[in-house]
Amino acid sequence: MEDFRMKQARPGNRIFLLGLVFIIWAWNSIGHSAELSSVIDQGLKTIDVQPASPQLLVVTNAPYLHQQDVSGLIYVRAIEKTAGATVGSGNLLFFWSDSSSPLLVMLFNKEHGKSVVIKQRGDDFHSETFDLSWEKVNQPQFWDEAGTYLLGRDLSVLVPLAQAWAKGVPYEYMKLAELHGDLCPGITAGYLMVKYLEKEYPLGNGEQYIIVATPSYCKDDAFQLLLGSTAGKKRLVASQLSEEQKKNITVPHPAGIVIVWNPSTRTGKGLALSFNFDDVREVVPTGKDSPKPIITMSLFKWFNQPERFVKVAAKFAVDNTVYKKIRETGVNPYELVGLTKK
């Protein structure tokens, strides 16, 4: 009588099954890519722009996605081929998102601000058309209504990126969205601090910026991406303070401590940074209670004048003992260097 017990699959069968799985995966990937290309092509017509036009910007989270064993890079290829946007041309921008997030692609015509945003929903792609002109998106009413759109808060990620590009701000600023996920007022404050340091305290031969990110908030991602002052290189340490500790700091609006350090001589200079968001709100045309994207966009014109918001509240010498101690867990860096109330 024939034995129906499970038997080990023959090598030929295994190869056939693996090949079948690959064919199904490839077919699905090609199908998704082709559908996206079709939606992009229609979107370009909607916003009245030709592929590879200097008026066209494409923003997407595609490189960071990995869904059902499909890399988001297949979508990047579809975008490049259909829209003609490329990294080298400066009109293809990315922003970080979780690998399981839905695909987002924004097509933006800077001539008049008309935009189509494509969002993946299951196996389908849905699109919405917006007027994202500078005048429109800098009105609080636009953001009051944003929750009624399919995209919701995604607009707060996409709009500042599009407007930064349209205004010609430095490419390095827009790259921050690839680490931070958006261009919020906090990461923009970090950008201003970086520009201030480079302008007022440029590094000498062999020197490094060491960041003591206390208190830590969005700003600190700018130090990591733009200065290379990362935690992995031991050039950034981050910590928070209790409310009681904050009250005792003598630095107004504390934004962390930067050490200009020379590892060869083991000496450096400490800079206690101050960043006042009240000063930021004063330059927002629509008022201090404006939505965050408007606050961010109001700062673009100040990128060459970081000193308007960034100050050095105190300077101090740093020797090797202080350098080691200030980076230890549990140490209040302000107390260590005498910047707290007696």
What annotation goes with each model-predicted range?
Residues M1-G12:
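N-terminal secretory signal peptides that target proteins for export/translocation
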